[in-house]
Amino acid sequence: MSLQKSNKITPFLTFDRQKWAELRKSVPLKLTEQDLKPLLGFNEDLSLDEVSTIYLPLARLINYYIEENLKRQTVLHRFLDVASPKVPYIISIAGSVSVGKSTSARILQALLSQWPSERKVDLITTDGFLYPLTTLQEKDLLKRKGFPESYDIHRLIQFVSDIKSGKRHIQAPIYSHLTYDIIPDQYNVVDQPDIVILEGLNVLQSGMNYPSSPHNVFVSDFVDFSIYVDADEDLLKEWYVARFLKFRRSAFSDPNAYFHHYSKLSEQEAIRTASSIWDEINGLNLKQNILPSRERANLILIKGEDHAIQTVKLRK
């Protein structure tokens, strides 16, 4: 058996790092150290060993699911007697602020675009579907940024619905972490790729997170395979504070940065500020909205102290 035994009733198979790595089989590692460097997050130091151990087996699994999905589409279109439109396979990646969702998404994008054949893989972040800064200010939602009510959920649902309808030239708004706002009149265009990776805090959330929404469908209804990147909250807070301190010395020093004023803080002041932001905003959002969605994922990646993934949980 290549999984951990447990008496607890669970819908997941649980693998330790070594057992999961064995499932790579013969999947080739085509990434080099040079390829990996631009994929890493601002505060992460991830090795090629992590790619081989965790992400290559995951790429192999996802490729099996994609093959089965294509077969199901063919059966449905044959039954309906209609031409088969090109419908992208949607992978969602959820998890807390500072857990490393973006890095996981970029690594998967690189791997899935290279093997077993060349594919077009688009990566979209749901940050682009946040309300503009002026709207958040008008709604008094600046301290709720990242919470469900801070997103234009209707626009996001329409976006993923259009992808699954096989539509072409679909526009996704672009978010700037420098200005802390949507960039006006700039878009990423999704034009029938083979795979779309949708990364964000809210991609696993459902009706309970949007009680006032008139929709009876949500982003998760359009997703083919969902991933949740997990870690203990103490680690998440530690990583958030460390990232904040690095930003204070780099991105925040740009006079155009929304958080430029933080660059003038002393290190102790910056630590207190980052801790307060975590406790009042990010940690609260994690407990109320993000963590409760974890068990809906098809796969959970659990990180340890060094950002390395120690445990993988796969839905049966």
Swiss-Prot record:
A GO biological-process term: coenzyme A biosynthetic process
Gene name linked to the record: coaA
Binding annotation for ATP: G95, S96, V97, S98, V99, G100, K101, S102
Predominant localisation class: cytoplasm
EC number: 2.7.1.33
Entry protein name: Pantothenate kinase
Keyword Kinase: yes
Signal peptide residues on this chain, from the entry's feature table: none
Record-linked InterPro entries: P-loop_NTPase (IPR027417), PanK (IPR004566), PRK/URK (IPR006083)
